[in-house]
């Protein structure tokens, strides 16, 4: 006999602890949940009267009969018609109330102890001579449960375990049932390092002694049956031939296998050895399945066989039936069909019922229109001839897509071979685009056009290049490299011509006529084009923050006459995703590695677009020295700029040699070598306010390239800026960059100062160089060139909160000569007088309001 440890009684069917249950259990009571349907009251009375809930409908009918006989007592407590009420109460879908509880108390001669949430019970005495009571738990949802003492539940758990063990051990004859229950429900209580076992003469394990006092008796193969469907897969039972049930199972399986072999046409001489699922001959199949992590029977069955765990079998069965009915959407004991229901119809003079679909039902439910699948037409049948579908013929609908993510995923097959392994880099392996991409599906574009801007520029250039391709082919001798690339270049050439879009303005393509001997004009390589209209024949100057802004350092002028842009503004967006700042000159300190894309040399021999050199021996490089020298020099210059050093041969091209900062240097030498279109990044003018968009003449500051500084080293800047001298002059405040700008949220009481950047010769790491240029700052003044209109007076079209530019703070003193032709060491009066401005457009109107609060 098995010896087990003492444990407190627990509930095996409750999924989560209920606070009401915990309150009752702390006081020695146990709440047994009943099915949450309309018959909960009658289930409680049937269980407490007859120890089963299966008689709940009979209890309902007895209650209705008793209330009908005692009509004079219960009629006054029922609102409305008493007969209609009794007729509805006889139906299973009508909820019972306190009136029915009183009637059944009088019927069965018992008083009631009514429990409510957080209440120890209220005794309702109908007659003092009644010796027993109904213990009912009631909540506000019109639901009733049974309440028992904990001692009663302990005895019920023992009886339940005995009943299930008799079923599985004596009827099914499964081996080692008690041991399997302990392993499944209490695996943490086993200490396999300390235990004793006993063996018989044949080597079978017959008993296990645990250190905590538990003793488990193990079964022998002759007294049990195999848990597997085919006992031949279990060496524990297949070696014993005295099993009648297993022999019958094996005989049926053997006959079935022989029939399958005959049907398939095999000779029947195949080896009959099957891979055993339980290979150990001295260990039972149940223990071997447990060792493999397989449950020999459901956990609910194991809970029912545990004497210290009570399982609410009635509630579990009802819950399973409810889930099954909800899953398969079947009518269970209900003939209340709806339109669209799939059911069976009983036709006259037919021996079997046919599957049909309800199309229409009359209001009185006397007849209905159904579509019969067998005959393929719609007929009218009586409503009583409809019957629910049997469970084996019902096929549920497909689950919605939102439930698919909860279903198990199908495992993807693993690719065999070396493709599944992590590939290692080899230097002798080079990337060939032809091996991975098709030419017809791979188009390499230098930029991404938005709204087809400047379309005529590239279309005309392609057309001119197409006309000149045959002549270039005649002039250039054939080489091995051109012979290899000629077929691919022709395919690319044909595809480019086929996918070419016709220009919208055909007259623009006829303005230029190119002769056969003349070289085609270079393509205009541009990264950004401001969204402002420009006059014909003039390309808008780039802002200093753009990659084309360092004109002093990289003087690559665009050769040829630029093509006129369209009248409306347009943009070429680069692949980097950095949008252009608003038009206007924005300061940027020091040289940076961003540079414009220069035009290639015109005397390059070859066909089609240039390609990358991939061969290790360099056989795919151009044969002409001009192209090699051009790109080699470009790489050397890029290397110097990436390391943030100045190339030795370009020192004379700079407009300055030191950082232009008067706050840190007492004196400097200014080298004037810039023109009108090439402004340095340090001495550029901040963007103007939109209020001056209607001005007709630019400020003199825009026409001057350099501004000399005040070399007064005695001046000390305080916390707040000093009062400006000669405030009526428009040149001084317009170029006064370190002047703090008032914040719009502080009403002019707070100002933003700009910090001094690091010198240009400071070494910066390459990752920092690849960052995009900083956004433009916010300047709140009214002097400057014409700007876009459309903004309100006193507002700025740019968003507040943008970071300040990295500039060198400096001042331009009044009467300082801004003319580029002047000498850098001399101060001369200004030769160009500014145009008279209105009072509202003068800088004094901007700074006076915030400085004199």
UniProtKB/Swiss-Prot annotation:
Q: Name one GO biological process term.
A: ovarian fusome organization
Q: Which UniProt keywords apply?
A: Amyloid, Cytoplasm, Hydrolase, Ubl conjugation pathway
Ranges for the region named Disordered are 1-20, 460-531, 681-704, 732-794, 817-853
Active-site positions on this chain: 37, 40, 143
Q: Which spans does this entry mark as compositional bias, Polar residues?
A: 747-758
User: What function does this protein fulfil?
Assistant: Catalytic component of a deubiquitinase complex consisting of bam and otu. The complex deubiquitinates K63-linked polyubiquitinated proteins; this antagonizes the ubiquitination activity of Traf6 and regulates the IMD immune signaling pathway. Otu-bam deubiquitinase activity is regulated by Traf6 dependent immune signaling regulation of bam expression levels; this forms a feedback loop that regulates the IMD immune signaling pathway and balances gut immune activity during aging. The complex deubiquitinates and stabilizes CycA/cyclin-A to regulate CycA-dependent differentiation.
Instruction: Tell me how this protein assembles.
Output: Self aggregates, forming amyloid-like fibrillar helical structures; protein aggregation is mediated by the C-terminal LC domain, is enhanced by RNA binding and is essential for deubiquitinase activity. Interacts (via OTU domain) with bam (via C-terminus); the interaction enhances otu aggregation and deubiquitinase activity. Together with bam interacts with CycA/cyclin-A; the interaction stabilizes CycA by promoting its deubiquitination. Together with bam interacts with Traf6. Interacts with Hrb27C; the interaction is RNA-independent.
Instruction: Identify the coding gene.
Output: otu
Q: What is this protein called?
A: Deubiquitinase otu
Q: What happens when the gene is disrupted?
A: Female sterile. Chamberless ovarioles with little or no germ cell or cystoblast proliferation in the germarium. Some ovarioles become tumorous due to uncontrolled division of cystoblasts that fail to fully differentiate into nurse cells or oocytes. Aberrant spectrosome to fusome conversion during cystocyte differentiation characterized by abnormal actin filament organization in stage 10 nurse cells. Only a small number of eggs mature, and those that do have a dorsalized phenotype.
Task: Give, as one word, the top-level EC class.
Answer: hydrolase
Question: Where does the record place Low complexity bias?
Answer: 499-517, 783-794, 820-838
Where is this chain compositionally biased, Basic and acidic residues type?
A: 460-470
Q: What is known of its domains?
A: The N-terminal 423 amino acids, which includes the OTU deubiquitinase domain and the tudor domain, is essential for germ cell proliferation and early germ cell differentiation up to stage 10 of oogenesis.
């Amino acid at each position: 006999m098995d010896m087990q440890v003492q444990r407190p009684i627990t509930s095996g069917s409750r999924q989560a602890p209920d606070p009401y249950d915990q309150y009752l259990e702390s006081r020695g009571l146990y709440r047994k949940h009943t099915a949450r349907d309309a018959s909960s009251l009658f289930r409680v009375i049937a269980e407490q009267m007859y120890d089963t809930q299966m008689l709940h409908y009979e209890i309902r009918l007895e209650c209705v009969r008793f209330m009908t006989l005692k009509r004079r007592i219960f009629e006054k407590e029922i609102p409305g018609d008493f007969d209609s009420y009794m007729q509805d109460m006889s139906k299973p879908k009508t909820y019972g109330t306190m009136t029915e509880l009183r009637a059944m108390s009088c019927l069965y001669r018992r008083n009631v102890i009514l429990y409510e949430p957080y209440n120890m019970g209220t005794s309702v005495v109908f007659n003092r001579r009644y010796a027993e009571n109904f213990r009912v738990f009631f909540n506000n949802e019109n639901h009733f449960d049974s309440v028992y003492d904990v001692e009663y539940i302990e005895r019920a758990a023992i009886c339940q375990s005995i009943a299930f063990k008799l079923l599985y051990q004596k009827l099914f004859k499964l081996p080692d049932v008690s041991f399997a229950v302990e392993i499944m429900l209490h695996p943490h209580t086993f200490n396999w390092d300390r235990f004793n076992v006993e063996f018989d003469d044949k080597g079978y394990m017959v008993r296990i002694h645990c250190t905590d006092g538990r003793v488990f008796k193990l079964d022998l193969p002759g007294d049990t049956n195999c848990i597997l469907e085919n006992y031949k897969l279990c060496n524990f039972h297949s070696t014993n031939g005295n099993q009648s049930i297993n022999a019958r199972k094996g005989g049926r399986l053997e006959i079935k296998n022989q029939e399958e072999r005959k049907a398939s046409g095999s000779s029947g001489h195949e080896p009959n050895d099957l891979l055993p699922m339980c290979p150990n001959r001295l260990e039972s199949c149940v223990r071997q399945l447990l060792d493999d992590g397989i449950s020999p029977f459901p956990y609910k069955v194991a809970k029912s066989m545990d004497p210290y765990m009570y399982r609410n079998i009635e509630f579990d069965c009802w819950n399973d039936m409810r889930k099954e009915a909800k899953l398969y959407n079947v009518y269970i004991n209900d003939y209340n069909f709806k339109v669209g229901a799939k059911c069976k119809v009983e036709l006259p003079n037919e021996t079997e019922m046919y599957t049909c679909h309800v199309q229409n039902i009359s209001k009185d439910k006397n007849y209905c229109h159904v579509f019969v699948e067998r005959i393929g037409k719609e007929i009218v049948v009586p409503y009583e001839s409809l019957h629910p579908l049997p469970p084996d013929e019902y096929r549920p609908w497909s689950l919605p897509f939102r439930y698919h993510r909860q279903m198990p995923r199908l495992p993807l097959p693993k690719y065999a071979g070396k493709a599944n392994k992590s590939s290692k880099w080899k230097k002798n392996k080079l990337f060939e685009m032809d091996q991975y991409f098709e030419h017809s599906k791979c188009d390499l574009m230098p930029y991404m056009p938005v709204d087809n801007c400047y379309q005529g520029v590239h279309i005309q250039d392609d057309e001119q290049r197409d006309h000149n391709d045959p002549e270039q082919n005649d002039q250039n001798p054939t080489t091995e490299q051109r012979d290899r690339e000629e077929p691919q270049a022709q395919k690319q050439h044909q595809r480019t011509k086929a996918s070419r879009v016709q220009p919208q303005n055909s007259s623009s393509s006829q303005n230029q006529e190119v002769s056969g001997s003349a070289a085609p004009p270079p393509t205009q390589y541009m990264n950004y084009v401001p969204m402002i209209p420009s006059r014909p024949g003039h390309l808008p100057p780039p802002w200093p923050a753009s990659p084309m802004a360092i004109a002093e350092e990289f003087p690559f002028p665009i050769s040829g006459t630029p093509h006129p842009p369209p009248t409306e503004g347009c943009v070429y967006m680069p692949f980097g995703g950095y949008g252009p700042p608003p038009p206007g000159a924005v300061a940027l300190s020091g040289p940076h590695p961003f540079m414009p894309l220069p035009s290639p040399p015109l005397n390059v021999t070859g066909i089609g677009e240039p390609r990358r050199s991939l061969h290790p021996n360099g056989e795919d490089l151009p044969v002409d020295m001009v192209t090699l020298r051009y790109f080699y020099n470009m790489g050397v210059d890029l290397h110097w700029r990436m390391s943030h050093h100045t190339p030795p041969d370009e020192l004379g091209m700079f407009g300055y040699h030191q950082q232009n900062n008067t706050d840190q240097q007492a004196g400097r030498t200014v080298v004037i070598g810039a023109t009108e279109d090439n402004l340095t990044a340090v001495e550029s003018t901040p963007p103007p306010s939109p209020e001056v968009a209607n001005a007709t003449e630019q400020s003199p500051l825009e026409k001057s390239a350099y501004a000399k500084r005040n070399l007064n080293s005695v001046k000390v800047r305080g916390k707040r800026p000093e009062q400006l001298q000669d405030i009526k002059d428009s040149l001084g405040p317009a170029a006064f960059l370190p002047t703090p700008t008032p914040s719009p949220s502080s009403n002019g009481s707070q100002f933003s100062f700009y910090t001094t950047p690091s010198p240009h010769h400071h070494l910066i790491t390459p990752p920092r160089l690849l960052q995009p240029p900083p956004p433009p700052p916010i300047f709140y003044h009214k002097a400057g060139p014409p700007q876009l209109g459309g903004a309100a007076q006193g507002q700025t079209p740019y968003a507040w909160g943008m970071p300040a530019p990295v500039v060198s703070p400096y001042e331009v003193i009044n009467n300082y000569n801004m003319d580029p032709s002047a000498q850098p060491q001399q101060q001369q009066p200004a030769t160009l007088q500014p145009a008279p401005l209105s009072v509202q457009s003068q800088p004094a109107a901007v700074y006076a309001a915030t400085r004199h609060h």
